[in-house]
Amino acid sequence: MTEVGVAVVPVAAILPLRAAVLRPGLPVEEARYEEDELSATLHLAAYDADGRVVGCSTWFPDPLDGRDAWRLRGMATAPEVRGSGVGARLVEAGLAVGTERGYGLTWCNARTPAVGFYRRYGFVPVGEEFLAVHDIPHYLMVREART
């Protein structure tokens, strides 16, 4: 596992990585979300030993099917650290905050190749595959809090 620290940061700290991984070739502003500046939004950065941001995730309240829920969006890891546990640290940290805030349901729209990754943390695909931004295949994935 790559040695990383995870910290709560302002969106400006993670936007360059989010843009490079999730919106390659587009202006950085294309990677901004409406929810980025909400007071309840949580931005997490994973830092390597040199202080470089190598992973990021954004979490915020967003109801699903009429239920209060915690949503994960903008999950990204630098290509050179994929498979090293950086993503795991980010998901575990974000889920822990959701639990602290009382959310029993967490959800995300996961890119199809990442479905297996999210399954490891208790997320389950719901419904059919769909095309999201820039026609990239995704699945809605939900996770009920473990009791």
Predicted regions and their residues:
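Conserved GNAT acetyl-CoA-binding A-motif
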Residues: V91, G98-R111
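A short beta-loop-alpha structural element at the N-terminal edge
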Residues: M1-L15
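Conserved active-site tyrosine of GNAT-family acetyltransferases
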Residues: R18, Y118, F123
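Conserved catalytic-core motifs of GNAT/GCN5-like acyltransferases
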Residues: W107-N109, V124-L140
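Active-site rim helix/loop that mediates acceptor-substrate recognition in acyltransferases
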Residues: R18-A49, V53
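Conserved acetyl-CoA pyrophosphate-binding loop and the N-cap/start of the following alpha-helix
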Residues: V81, G85-A93
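Conserved beta-strand in the GNAT
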Residues: A45, R52-D62, D68-A76
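Residue-level recognition of the GNAT/N-acetyltransferase active site
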Residues: A78, R82, R111
